[in-house]
Amino acid sequence: MSLLTEVETYVLSIIPSGPLKAEIAQRLEDVFAGKNTDLEALMEWLKTRPILSPLTKGILGFVFTLTVPSERGLQRRRFVQNALNGNGDPNNMDRAVKLYRKLKREITFHGAKEVALSYSTGALASCMGLIYNRMGTVTTEVAFGLVCATCEQIADSQHRSHRQMVTTTNPLIRHENRMVLASTTAKAMEQMAGSSEQAAEAMEVASQARQMVHAMRTIGTHPSSSAGLKDDLLENLQAYQKRMGVQIQRFK
């Protein structure tokens, strides 16, 4: 796996699924391929994206700044600086300085990532802030190691939280989670269906599912009533894809 592929993988792992993730993936690909060279426009676009947390925007801004060639005097962006200040905690800043000194001695991506993984997310963000604000310099490879270590920590905590939700025994949370998944699956079906004649059936199924979820939420239903809703939808979607000659088995 090439370095940039690895960076793209780690960065995308912390972004919630949805159309925005697909858009960000495209921007990252363009930036890494040298197709997007207007850093100012890129940062303005990033700043106004909804849904993303300030830290995620800060990390993306840092990656764009590292990758896109820019004039020496180009202003640093406040939204990135604020996201990478370690919540203003002096402890984070102290640890970030210690980490920075260690990173100065590293020359490889993996070496830097290994060193960085033993620090807290706050310290890692502060260290990125130091480099972003030009208070310290490391090689691009080392900076990317720092980025990936930060993303790995964030993805780990997201995964733990997701696992807790999936394995919860609380029937109300499980019920709501099934309805949310059914709703997003229906949305994906509508987007994939396009405008062909065979698509009408898939669109109908998706529309009915969304109406059903809407009704269940409106009148309030027994927590077990949503069981199998998403699986039924996926079966319909896969049957539709088979007829269309498309084989995508990755939704489950």
UniProtKB/Swiss-Prot annotation:
GO terms for molecular function: RNA binding; structural constituent of virion. Gene3D superfamilies: 1.10.10.180, 1.20.91.10. It is a peripheral membrane protein. A motif (Nuclear localization signal) lies at residues 101-105. Residues 165-252 are annotated as: RNP-binding. InterPro entries: Flu_matrix_M1, Flu_matrix_M1_C, Flu_matrix_M1_N, Flu_matrix_M1_N_sub1, Flu_matrix_M1_N_sub2, INFV_M1. The keyword Membrane applies. SUPFAM superfamilies: Influenza virus matrix protein M1. It holds the Pfam family Flu_M1_C. Its main location: virion. GO terms for cellular component: host cell nucleus; membrane; virion membrane. Residues 1-164 are annotated as: Membrane-binding. One of its GO terms (biological process) is viral budding from plasma membrane. It is found in: Virion membrane; Host nucleus. Keywords: Host nucleus, Membrane, RNA-binding, Viral matrix protein, Virion. Most abundant protein in virion. When expressed alone can form virus-like particles in transfected cells. Belongs to the influenza viruses Matrix protein M1 family. Homodimer and homomultimer. Interacts with NEP. Binds ribonucleocapsid by both interacting with genomic RNA and NP protein. May interact with HA and NA. Cannot bind NP without genomic RNA. Plays critical roles in virus replication, from virus entry and uncoating to assembly and budding of the virus particle. M1 binding to ribonucleocapsids (RNPs) in nucleus seems to inhibit viral transcription. Interaction of viral NEP with M1-RNP is thought to promote nuclear export of the complex, which is targeted to the virion assembly site at the apical plasma membrane in polarized epithelial cells. Interactions with NA and HA may bring M1, a non-raft-associated protein, into lipid rafts. Forms a continuous shell on the inner side of the lipid bilayer in virion, where it binds the RNP. Determines the virion's shape: spherical or filamentous. Clinical isolates of influenza are characterized by the presence of significant proportion of filamentous virions, whereas after multiple passage on eggs or cell culture, virions have only spherical morphology. Filamentous virions are thought to be important to infect neighboring cells, and spherical virions more suited to spread through aerosol between hosts organisms. This is Matrix protein 1.
